[in-house]
Amino acid sequence: MESDITLLHEWLTSRQITTKEQWMDEIASTLAGRVSEQIFFGHLSTGALNDLERVTKQVYAMVAYYGMSEKVGTISYYDSTGQSDMAFTKPYSERTAQQIDDEVKAIIAEAYAMAERTINENREGLTELAELLLEREVVFTEDVERILGPREPKQESAPETETTETAEV
């Protein structure tokens, strides 16, 4: 049985380059089911366990491996050698561990708030979509676009800076 560290390593190394903004959107999307339970039903269930586990691992990776935290800093505590699988020590102090934990909680709270805003802004349409799904058991892209509007186009990355050629002397 593979350890969680090995599985996380496989997940991290199989990913393509992702920006912090893309990860925040992905995390908010993952939390949307739990947020929806709270907004629409007024309670939480155990149904989001897998989502919470994935989000927690992803945010710890953002903070402790990819240096995507201003508070913790641009530093990586990731050990690509695999040596940490055998040792039960962290390559940082308890104070840093607490900073990492605090930052992870703050980032998850921020993504949760993003999901809440999005769901609340689209509550009427989501209710209509849910009713349609209960009625027909399937909805199509056209239904979603009619109810919620067309999907926003993906943001293009910034254009590369043009280079000027110099004449050979």
Regions flagged by a language model, labelled:
Residues 1-169:
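Soluble catalytic regions of large protease machineries
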